[in-house]
A protein has these predicted regions:
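S-adenosyl-L-methionine-dependent methyltransferase catalytic core, i.e., the SAM/SAH-binding region
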Residues: 1-114
Length: 114
């Protein structure tokens, strides 16, 4: 696993613009990858926005945890598939979210490892 953030999120500005994160919103990034979109959402929803980031790839989870560590308890990174999002949210006690991101394309990080 690389130590830097190996993937620049596609349509980053557009996602932040259209999602329009606010404080104290709650957000779900179903395909966190290295955490780029999640980081932007947390920055835009400061000081009290919260985010759950999911990814099935253990390497991506480690990268997302490192990327989102500065946000402390505002960021929860979980090793899970987006298909488990309802279960994950129920387990942490969230009944609703204010926005969801699913970046369903293949990342350059995945292609580099193939």
């Amino acid at each position: 696993m690389e130590t830097g953030v190996p993937h620049r999120p596609v349509l980053y500005q557009e996602i932040i613009q259209y999602l329009a994160p606010f404080s104290p919103g709650r957000y779900l990034d179903c395909t966190a990858g290295a955490g780029g979109h999640s980081k932007g959402i947390l920055e835009a929803s400061a000081p009290d926005g919260q985010l759950v980031a999911l990814d099935l790839d253990p390497d991506a989870v480690a990268l997302a945890r490192a990327t989102l560590a500065p946000f402390g308890s505002r960021a929860i990174v979980i090793h899970a598939s987006y298909t488990e999002s309802a279960q994950v949210l129920a387990e942490i006690g969230w009944q609703k979210v204010d926005g969801i991101v699913l970046d369903l394309g293949v990342s350059s990080m995945q292609l580099d490892r193939a």
